[in-house]
């Protein structure tokens, strides 16, 4: 079988915490986040590749982990499972980035011991989902799916991170507090700095980038509910 691939990064030091990773970006997404920095690139780049071709395309001189990202990689269930299996056979830890809408794919990865790290993008407060990311499911349905993934990970010793890109004038402190309360059982919660220049939506390019001290204050709010909280900025990752 062939996976639809948008791009491959041979070496990243930010996508898998504390590891140097190769990142495989799978084509396709079921959301349209206005701040997304991958969407335009993904829509313009697509090629069919076998798993062997994908791994032959990666220079493993420095990478010691594999990240499967997107788009939304779980839309290509068979490809995700085959890539993860191939990576594990080669001895690599595997991380997947997901919006949480397909817990059944994560469940199969966990059941077959093909995944070590799950990072879930929590886009906004769940009651704002339909409006904010233009998805089919309502926020309550997505919330339940995300909570199912967190529960699966916790029961099977798979590290689970939740993360939110904080967009000023669209989100506020109450949003972060509501999200943190909801995903309080995750192993790590990351608040990420919005970068307007990379936004897919032209209107979002006009919004300000949140200041680091603002993110730190938001991190303190999240810390009331979650032990491990970090902020991710253009200057690096910082524990709260």
UniProtKB/Swiss-Prot annotation:
InterPro entries: Aldolase_TIM (IPR013785), NrdG2 (IPR012840), Radical_activat_CS (IPR001989), Radical_SAM_PqqE_MftC-like (IPR050377), rSAM (IPR007197). Residues 14-232 form the Radical SAM core domain. The keyword Nucleus does not apply. S-adenosyl-L-methionine binds at residues 35-37, 71, 126-128. Coiled coil: none annotated. [4Fe-4S] cluster binds at residues 29, 33, 36. One of its GO terms (molecular function) is 4 iron, 4 sulfur cluster binding. Binds 1 [4Fe-4S] cluster. The cluster is coordinated with 3 cysteines and an exchangeable S-adenosyl-L-methionine. It catalyses: glycyl-[protein] + reduced [flavodoxin] + S-adenosyl-L-methionine = glycin-2-yl radical-[protein] + semiquinone [flavodoxin] + 5'-deoxyadenosine + L-methionine + H(+). Pfam families: Fer4_12, Radical_SAM. PANTHER family: GLYCYL-RADICAL ENZYME ACTIVATING ENZYME MJ1227-RELATED, RADICAL SAM DOMAIN PROTEIN. This is Putative glycyl-radical enzyme activating enzyme MJ1227.
